[in-house]
Amino acid sequence: MEKTISAIATPQGAGGIGIIRISGDRALSVADAVFHAVSKAKLSELPGMRALYGTVVDRKGTVIDEAVALVFRAPHSYTAEDVVELQCHGGSAVLRRVLARTYEGGAAPAERGEFTKRAFLNGRLDLTQAAAVMDV
């Protein structure tokens, strides 16, 4: 897949934690542009299956929200691509701002079902599994 995509991965409504998922070749660089780890580590330098605590910032460096970033390296992710999940506060205003920041960082809006489509096209799911996910 050429484009890197992002979307809110949690249901809308009242929830304490919300997740923004980023997937594609540039997922780590998009996340590095918007997430600053307290440890100063770059997500792009981490091996997979790692988490860092930090903040999501706007272009000026102003904090939007605190977050935990989880890195899943290809092919060991749902989509078989590099994936970053930004877990922040679950309010809709915060999630919209964090999502908008990922777009500014270079991600494109994901179409409905696009993460599952990528998982299918990349061999992570068979047709029956993909159809079952889409039915949920």
Describe each model-derived feature in a short phrase:
Residues M1-V136:
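A glycine-rich (often HGG/GG-containing) alpha/beta subdomain
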